[in-house]
A protein has these predicted regions:
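Beta/alpha (TIM)-barrel catalytic core signal, keyed to glycine-rich beta->alpha loops juxtaposed to Asp/Glu
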Residues: 80-218
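Short, acidic/polar
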Residues: 1-4, 52-68, 117-126, 210-215
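Active-site groove signature of glycoside hydrolases
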Residues: 64-87
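Aromatic/hydrophobic pocket-lining residues that form the small-molecule binding cavity
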Residues: 23, 56, 60, 92-95, ...
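Conserved, mostly hydrophobic/aromatic
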Residues: 4, 12, 27, 41, ...
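A short, structured active-site edge motif that brings together acidic residues
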Residues: 37-49, 71, 75-78, 138
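N-terminal binding-site loop/beta-alpha segment at the start of enzyme catalytic domains
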Residues: 1-39, 70, 98, 104
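A structural motif
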Residues: 9, 69-72, 108, 132
Length: 218
């Protein structure tokens, strides 16, 4: 993180389960030496735990404590896959109302969601009467041109019929909702192209890395 800060990176993303539950604490410790206004911090409500409102409150308070901050710049409903999950956790359990209250109090600056679902789920999310500030979706040049490819570490999370990337991107453009991109390197695979594929790119920009092409795309 020190290297990243020194080279202009100012957006940091963490979550409750990352690195076996220690990511938030590590990120908080690393960032505490820097002025709070010098970086943007994103964290997430663990949808997969199906938390109640009270459990969500406990999780949120613990996240602030672990990250050593008084507010999150970006806060996400983590990994929305199915309509039923969203309805159970965020509507029936009252977790969305709780998070909206935290936003009113200034403890969440921007509220959004990360998406791993099918077309039905995306259309449902966009139809809700909620003033979302942003959404996070998987976007890279491979998925825009070919069938959606699941990164290995995501396999157990993704529905069998994920929304096609091109369709999803067009749907998000129509909604006007700002996007944050995840998986620009497709789990690192677009940074490790075979020699034949890399040679095609190098005919245009010989010194550019495979990773730089992927980042330029998004």
């Amino acid at each position: 993180i020190d290297y990243a800060m020194a080279h202009g990176v100012n957006y940091y993303d963490t979550a409750w389960p990352y690195h076996r539950g220690v990511s938030e604490s590590v990120v908080g410790k690393a960032l505490q030496q820097y002025p709070r206004e010098s970086f943007y911090l994103a964290d997430k409500m663990p949808t997969y735990l199906l938390p109640t409102r009270e459990q969500a409150r406990e999780i949120f308070e613990k996240q602030l404590e672990k990250c050593k901050v008084e507010y999150f710049d970006y806060y996400l409903l983590h990994a929305i896959r199915f309509v039923e999950d969203y309805q159970t956790v965020y509507e029936k359990n009252g977790v969305l109302d709780y998070l909206l209250e935290q936003k009113k109090q200034g403890r969440i600056r921007n509220l959004g969601w990360s998406f791993y679902g099918n077309t039905e789920t995306l259309e449902y999310l966009l139809s809700r009467d909620v003033q979302w500030d942003f959404a996070m979706v998987q976007l890279n040049y491979h998925d825009m041109l070919h069938e959606y490819k699941i990164a290995p570490h995501q396999a157990r999370f993704i529905p069998k019929d994920p929304a096609p990337t091109q369709w999803m991107f067009e749907k998000m453009q129509q909604s006007g909702l700002p996007l944050i991109v995840m998986e620009p390197l497709l789990g690192g695979r677009l940074a490790r192209l075979n020699k034949k594929a890399l040679a095609v790119l190098q005919t245009e920009r010989p010194q550019a890395s495979a990773a730089s092409w992927a980042f330029r795309y998004v």
